[in-house]
C-alpha cells in the first residue's frame, strides 16, 4: 500500500526556474562513475567526489555544490579543465560521522541569473540532473559498522503459510478446534479456501486445512532438494484466524500447528540440512480475542484491557471511550492497535531477558520478518534490532516496507531504514513491481533498469544484498495469475473461487513467470519462493492466493525450472555477492551483469574472478543482443546455463534470444 513519497530535500531558499537554460546547460548523472564516485551509499567517515559538466563556452561566475540535511553547506566547485570541449567542475566532500541522508543540488550564477541543476522528478533522488528542478539528489550515509548476516546474501528463501503447506503424518491437527470458536475444518486438502465475509467486509478467515509444523518437518527433504536454505513462516503463534496476524498469545505456538517442542525439533532438523527458520513478528496490533485484550471473554471475565481498565495490559491500548471505542489497525475492530512505546509493552516484547523477540531466537530461530514495519516507531525498531543481535549476531531483522526503504514516507514522516540502526533489510516489492511492469509491457527495459539502479544507489551493500526478493506473497494474487494478465480483480470477490486461467493464459503466464524467476535468481538479495508457486498454483487475491500446496499434482515443468534456477544460483557465488549492473539492450530485453574482479567480490572479500550475464526477452519475437567483451570482464567465451557456447568475434558477442525466453551466461 503506497502511503507517501520522499521529500524534495529543499531546506532553505527555493530558486525559481530561469529562462537561460537554452544556452547554459549543466550535466550530472548519479549513476555515472565519472560524475559520482564511489557509486552507491557511503559509509560514515567516507569521501565522495562529485563532478559537473558545463556545456557552454562561457564559464559561470560562480558554481557551488549545495548539500543539506537539517544544516546546509555550500562547497565551491573547482574547474578541472576541458573534456570533449566541455568544462568539468569537481567538489570532494566528507560525509561526516553521522548516519543520515544527504541531499544535494548544483547552483551557479550565469548572466545575472541563478541557475539550478536538481534531480529528476521521479522521487528516487537518482539519475540524470534536470535544469531548474527543485528535487534533490540523494546520498545515503550509513553506519560504517553496519553489517548483515552472510546467510542472507547467500540464501534462497521459502515462505510458508503453515496451515496450507502440509498435514504432518501421525498428528491430529484437525482435532485441535478452537475453544468457543466457530471454525471450519476442510477434510479435502485440495478444496479452495472459503470466503466468509463479515458485516464489516472483512473475511472471517476461520477455515482450516490442518497444515502444521510436523508437516513442514516431514517435507524438509523436498525443500532441500528444491535448493532452499531459509524458511520464513507466516505467524505461528496462537490466534483466532487461519492467517494468524491477530495474535492471541505471543508465548505459545498455536496448538493447531504444534507446540514449542515441535518448533524446536523443526529448527534443529532444518539446521542439520543447512536451513534456517525465520518467524513473522506482528507487533503493531494484536487480536481482539487475545490474552491482552479479551474482547470476546475467552480468557475470563476480568482478564484483558477490554474487560478490565485495571488490567496490566490496559496501557498497551488507546481507548477513546472504554471499552468499545479504541484505536485499531486500519479500522478493523478485530485488530486493536498497541502503543509500542508503552514501557510495559516494550519490556514484554523487547527488553526483558526472556522477552518475546529474545525467547524465540533462543529457541533456535534465526530472526524476524516484521509485519507492517513502517508502522512501528523508529525507537522501537532500533531496540528490537539491538535485542535480537544481543541474543545472536547472526540473527536477522527483515521489515515489510513496500517502497524504497531509504526514504519511505509514513504518516507524514520520512523514515530511512537503511542506515544500519533498524532493519537488516526489507521485502523487495519495488523489484517485484518493476519486473511485473516490464513483463506486462507497461514499462520498457530502460525505465526498469533505471529504477533498479536507483535502488542499488540508495541502499548500502549490506542492505541491498540481504533483500527479500519476492515474486509472490500472501498479500497478492498468485504470480502466475498476475503475469497471465488475469488475476480476477475485475470480477466480484464472491466469484473468484471458481476463477481459472484458460490454457492460453496459463501458458503465457508460465513463460513470463520463468523469465521473472531467472531474473530474481540473478540479482543481489535472497530470492524468495512463495509456497506453491514452484508447483504452478494459481489463485486470485486473498484468500484464494492462500490455497494448499498441491502435493502429487504439481506442474512438473514449472517445478523443474525453479529447481534449475536455485541450483544455478547456489552453484555460482558471483550471483550471490558479485558486483551488479543493470542493462537495457533494447526496449524488450532487460539484463543484469554480475562480476567478481581483481580477486574480490562486491564486499571486498576474496573471490574467484567471475562474470555472469542474465538477459530476459519479454517480446514474442526473437531478439539479437550485442555485448562487448569489455562488458563481461574481457571474456572471449560465454557458456549459458543450458550449455550453449557463445564466442566473441571482433570483440563482441551476438546473442539470440527467442521470444519469451531468457538466458544466463557465464564467462569462461
Positions of the model-derived regions?
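Glycan-association/targeting regions that enable binding to alpha-glucans and other polysaccharides
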Residues: 2-154, 158-159
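Conserved, mostly hydrophobic/aromatic
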Residues: 52, 160, 223, 233, ...
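C-terminal beta-strand-rich structural cap/linker in extracellular carbohydrate-active enzymes
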Residues: 56, 649-668
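Beta-strand-rich binding/interaction modules
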Residues: 59-70, 102-104, 622-645
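Substrate-binding/active-site clefts of carbohydrate-active enzymes
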Residues: 161-230, 236-363, 384-390, 407
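Aromatic/acidic polysaccharide-binding cleft in carbohydrate-active enzymes
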Residues: 163, 411-412, 425, 468-501, ...
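Carbohydrate-binding surface patches
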Residues: 583-632
Amino acid at each position: 500500500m503506497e502511503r507517501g513519497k520522499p521529500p524534495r530535500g529543499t531546506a532553505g531558499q527555493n530558486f525559481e526556474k530561469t529562462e537561460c537554460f537554452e544556452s547554459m546547460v549543466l550535466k550530472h548523472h548519479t549513476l555515472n562513475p565519472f560524475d559520482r564516485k564511489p557509486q552507491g551509499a557511503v559509509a560514515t567517515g567516507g569521501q565522495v567526489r562529485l563532478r559537473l559538466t558545463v556545456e557552454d563556452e562561457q564559464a559561470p561566475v560562480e558554481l557551488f555544490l549545495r548539500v543539506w540535511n537539517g544544516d546546509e553547506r555550500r562547497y565551491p566547485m573547482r574547474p578541472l579543465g576541458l573534456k570533449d570541449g566541455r568544462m568539468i567542475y569537481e567538489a570532494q566532500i566528507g560525509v561526516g560521522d553521522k548516519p543520515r541522508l544527504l541531499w544535494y543540488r548544483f547552483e551557479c550564477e550565469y548572466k545575472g541569473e541563478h541557475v539550478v541543476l536538481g534531480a529528476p522528478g521521479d522521487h528516487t533522488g537518482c539519475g540524470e540532473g534536470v535544469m531548474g528542478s527543485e528535487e534533490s539528489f540523494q546520498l545515503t550515509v550509513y553506519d560504517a559498522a553496519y553489517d548483515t548476516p552472510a546467510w542472507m546474501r547467500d540464501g534462497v528463501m521459502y515462505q510458508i503459510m503453515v496451515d496450507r503447506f502440509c498435514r504432518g503424518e501421525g498428528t491430529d491437527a484437525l482435532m485441535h478446534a478452537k475453544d468457543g470458536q466457530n471454525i471450519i475444518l476442510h477434510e479435502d486438502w485440495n478444496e479452495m479456501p472459503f470466503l466468509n465475509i463479515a458485516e464489516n467486509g472483512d473475511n472471517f478467515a476461520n477455515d482450516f486445512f490442518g497444515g502444521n509444523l510436523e508437516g513442514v518437518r516431514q517435507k524438509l527433504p523436498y525443500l532441500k532438494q528444491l535448493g532452499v536454505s531459509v524458511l520464513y513462516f507466516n505467524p505461528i503463534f496462537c490466534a483466532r484466524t487461519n492467517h494468524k496476524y491477530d495474535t492471541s498469545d505471543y508465548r505459545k505456538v498455536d496448538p493447531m500447528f504444534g507446540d514449542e517442542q515441535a518448533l524446536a525439533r523443526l529448527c534443529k532438523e532444518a539446521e542439520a540440512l543447512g536451513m534456517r527458520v525465520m518467524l513473522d513478528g506482528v507487533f503493531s496490533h494484536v487480536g481482539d480475542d487475545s490474552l491482552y485484550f479479551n474482547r470476546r471473554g475467552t480468557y475470563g471475565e476480568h482478564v484483558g484491557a477490554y474487560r478490565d481498565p485495571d488490567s496490566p495490559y490496559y496501557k498497551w491500548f488507546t481507548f477513546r471511550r472504554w471499552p468499545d471505542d479504541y484505536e485499531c489497525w486500519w479500522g478493523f475492530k478485530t485488530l486493536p492497535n498497541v502503543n509500542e512505546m508503552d514501557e510495559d509493552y516494550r519490556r514484554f516484547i523487547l527488553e526483558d531477558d526472556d522477552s518475546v523477540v529474545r525467547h524465540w531466537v533462543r529457541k533456535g530461530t534465526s530472526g524476524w520478518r516484521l509485519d507492517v514495519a513502517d508502522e512501528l516507531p523508529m525507537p522501537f525498531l532500533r531496540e528490537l534490532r539491538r535485542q535480537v543481535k544481543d541474543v545472536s549476531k547472526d540473527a536477522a531483522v527483515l521489515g515489510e516496507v513496500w517502497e524504497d526503504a531509504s526514504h519511505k514516507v509514513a504518516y507524514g514522516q520520512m523514515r530511512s531504514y537503511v542506515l544500519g540502526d533498524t532493519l537488516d533489510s526489507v521485502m523487495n516489492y519495488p523489484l517485484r513491481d518493476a519486473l511485473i511492469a516490464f513483463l506486462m509491457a507497461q514499462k520498457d527495459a530502460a525505465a526498469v533498469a533505471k529504477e533498479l539502479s536507483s535502488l542499488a544507489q540508495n541502499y548500502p551493500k549490506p542492505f541491498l544484498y540481504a533483500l527479500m526478493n519476492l515474486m509472490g506473497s500472501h498479500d497478492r494474487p498468485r504470480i502466475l495469475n498476475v503475469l497471465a494478465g488475469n488475476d480476477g480483480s475485475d470480477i466480484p470477490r464472491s466469484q473468484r473461487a471458481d476463477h481459472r486461467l484458460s490454457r492460453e493464459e496459463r501458458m503465457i503466464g508460465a513463460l513470463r513467470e520463468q523469465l521473472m524467476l531467472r531474473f530474481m535468481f540473478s540479482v543481489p538479495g535472497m530470492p524468495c519462493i512463495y509456497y506453491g508457486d514452484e508447483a504452478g498454483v494459481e489463485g486470485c487475491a486473498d484468500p484464494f492466493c492462500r490455497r494448499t500446496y498441491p502435493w502429487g499434482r504439481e506442474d512438473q515443468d514449472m517445478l523443474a525450472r525453479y529447481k534449475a534456477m536455485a541450483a544455478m544460483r547456489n552453484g555460482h557465488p558471483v550471483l550471490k555477492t558479485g558486483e551488479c549492473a543493470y542493462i537495457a539492450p533494447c526496449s524488450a530485453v532487460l539484463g543484469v551483469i554480475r562480476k567478481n574482479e581483481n580477486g574480490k567480490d562486491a564486499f571486498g572479500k576474496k573471490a574467484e574472478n567471475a562474470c555472469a550475464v542474465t538477459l530476459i526477452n519479454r517480446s514474442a519475437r526473437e531478439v539479437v543482443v550485442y555485448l562487448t567483451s569489455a562488458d563481461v570482464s574481457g571474456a572471449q567465451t560465454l557458456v549459458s546455463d543450458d550449455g550453449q557456447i557463445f564466442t566473441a568475434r571482433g570483440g563482441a558477442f551476438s546473442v539470440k534470444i527467442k521470444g519469451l525466453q531468457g538466458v544466463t551466461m557465464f564467462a569462461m
